């Protein structure tokens, strides 16, 4: 590209770890990212929208499937817009299953995603840190995860004076290896 005008980073996890609710990396960081207001770059400035308020269906290649993706803030936006001066819009999208979103909604409704201290039995705890302690360890999920992930970039811009659009992606096959006998 001579100029990049739009960038959509799309992170789809089509894997299934068999747990009712778990995060694929640090639960405290994951839940804070998902529930935080969304920031995306548009026309020279960051714009803010409510968490999870923008979503769309996305059809991944190579039979990964169609997933609902949600626009959210991810820190790489900061450096990308700084180092790509021609960029007009930059967004980060991530997929979440309806099951994940329902569990997250219930946890928010009962206060378990709070980051301010509460007193329980005379001890101050932070609900989100307590939740992290009782959720499955993300490091253990690989043993039971099956499916595919697809992460990629949809990029538009100009090359040699002509409009150009590409989707560059990577597919990862997740599987559980058989137990040694």
Predicted regions and their residues:
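C-terminal catalytic/substrate-binding lobe primarily of soluble NAD(P)-dependent oxidoreductases
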Residues: 2-177, 181
């Amino acid at each position: 590209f001579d100029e990049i005008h739009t960038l959509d980073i799309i992170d789809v996890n089509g894997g299934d770890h068999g747990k009712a609710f778990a995060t694929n990396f640090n639960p405290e960081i994951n839940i804070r990212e998902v529930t935080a207001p969304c920031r995306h770059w548009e026309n020279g400035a960051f714009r803010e929208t409510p968490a999870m308020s923008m979503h769309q269906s996305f059809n991944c290649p190579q039979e990964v499937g169609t997933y609902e993706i949600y626009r959210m803030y991810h820190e790489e936006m900061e450096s990308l817009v700084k180092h790509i001066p021609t960029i007009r819009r930059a967004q980060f999208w991530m997929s979440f299953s309806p099951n994940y979103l329902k569990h997250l909604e219930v946890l928010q409704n009962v206060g378990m995603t709070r980051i301010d201290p509460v007193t329980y039995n005379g001890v101050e705890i932070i609900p989100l840190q307590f939740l992290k302690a009782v959720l499955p360890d993300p490091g253990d999920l690989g043993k039971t995860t099956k499916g595919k992930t697809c992460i990629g970039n949809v990029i538009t811009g100009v090359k040699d004076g002509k409009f150009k659009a590409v989707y560059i992606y990577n597919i990862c096959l997740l599987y559980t290896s058989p137990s040694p006998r």
